[in-house]
Amino acid sequence: MQVILLEKVVNLGNLGEIVKVKDGYARNFLIPQRKARRATTAAVAEFEVKRAELEKIAAEKLAASQAQGEKLTGQTVQISQKSGVDGRLFGSVTNADIAVALTKQGFAVEKAQVRMPTGPLKVTGDHTVAVALHTDVVIEVTITIVGEHA
């Protein structure tokens, strides 16, 4: 299926590009998330009319994400979990836990924005995770896990 991208999509393209994607990806993700529209002749014509407005909205989102990124850069989040004597946690710290901790500190971060390529954190100490506020704005945050001995 051919779609027009309404915003920048990682590993796919930028705003306004017409790309060919699998039907399921378009129907189940891109179109419901309002990241793309079907590339019909009417939709292409309508997009060209609204292009400047969409580019302005995309620039505003990028500026807001960059401003939030500047505030969030260098932040340290402290999370306490029950742990054993050797420093291993009973359970783990996931991206949802980190998003909740950042939200408590006053940063609007969703769990999908927290990138943990090595998986959940299972050991006490300092860890660095990436937070993708925008496709172009990815910052690093230090997570300090403090063990509560059971």
Curated annotation (Swiss-Prot):
Keywords: Ribonucleoprotein, Ribosomal protein, RNA-binding, rRNA-binding. It comes from the Bacteria. GO terms for molecular function: rRNA binding; structural constituent of ribosome. One of its GO terms (biological process) is translation. One of its GO terms (cellular component) is ribosome. Belongs to the bacterial ribosomal protein bL9 family. This is Large ribosomal subunit protein bL9. It comes from Herminiimonas arsenicoxydans. The gene is rplI.
